[in-house]
Amino acid sequence: MTSSADYKNLESKYYMQVVNRMPPVLVRGEGTRVFDNDGNNYLDFTAGWAVLNLGHSHPAVTEAIRDQAGKILQMSNLFYTTPQLPLAKIIVDNSDIDRVFFCNSGAEANEGACKVARKWGKIKLNGAYEIITTLDSFHGRTQAMMAATGQPHYQDNWRPLMPGFVNVPYNNVQAIKDAYTEGKTCAVLLEPVQGEGGVNVPSDNYLKEVMDFCHDKNILFMLDEVQTGMGRLGTLFGYQQFPGVEPDVMTLAKALGSGAPLGAFTTKQFCSVLEPGDHGSTFGGNALTTAAGAAAAKVIVDEGIPRLATETGAYFQGKLMALAEKHSFIEEVRGMGLLIAIQMTQDIAAATVTAALPEGLLINAVRPNMVRFMPPLNVTRDEVDEAVAILDKVFANTSD
């Protein structure tokens, strides 16, 4: 058997050094657990970065991939293939959206949404092109999406940024109104809850007020549901947590493919402005990835998985709040569904992640003073208890 050290040597020799990797060489996953090359197992409270909402190796997903691999993997979108179209129907039937285009990633999905917005501005708003986004957002790592992402540490090495985006404070309706310029602004792009920005949950009326403003100005109200979609916040799509909110354009990825590389941008009929030749993708919506996506979506919808996110998320937050009573440096517990963070008074998030690893828990330092949790939505309460016990042990060794 190739040793973990051998794999790490291969990585250091051949792979671009763009990621600071954690030590385990992971070889297998099942449910909420992953297993490394040395036989250790870990609770995965990252879910492959909010991708594996049904956990690792869910039987319905693995069976769908195995079955589709023996039929057809890939054809040009010039031809009809299945199960691309049934997956599109599941999305439309369970949302306020009318049209779907499949791509390969969240960044691609957001690029597509911005193309919709730009064309809307061209044909409806006399050439308006600017898109308002928010500080602490995250929309991807392409050139355009780095300009859309309102975090300087993602942007600074790539300046000058692509024009056409303006970043304003999140959860501030007036900031969006102030940034709007008639004849220039064509859309607003927001996350229902900011994930990479620190699990920032907006006030109850924020999204609705922004939507109403967009409609008043005839600009598109676009929601990036790459991290929040497919049940993570407690409803199939995150916006459904906020009464009266309906996106004109919505993007998806991560959990959409349940581990297969699949994204989508979706529109209401009135703003479905792309025509043949306006957009395309060689691999987007191929038979293999949409087979995985359709299988996962069916389980999520039919088995009421978003409800588990609500119930287990509330249980998990309660346990974390109890930890905060014991450890005074835990300043705040916040989140929605199973997208949760703890904020601390000290910059010890990285140390917490490092200390939790040998205890058997995978978590994420989303800010220097903040740890993020995004486990599979079918995580059990016993697994939550196990994770909290590990955190308690780690925090007990942290100076208040």
Predicted regions and their residues:
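Conserved N-terminal phosphate-binding loop of PLP-dependent enzymes in the Aspartate aminotransferase
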Residues: 1-400
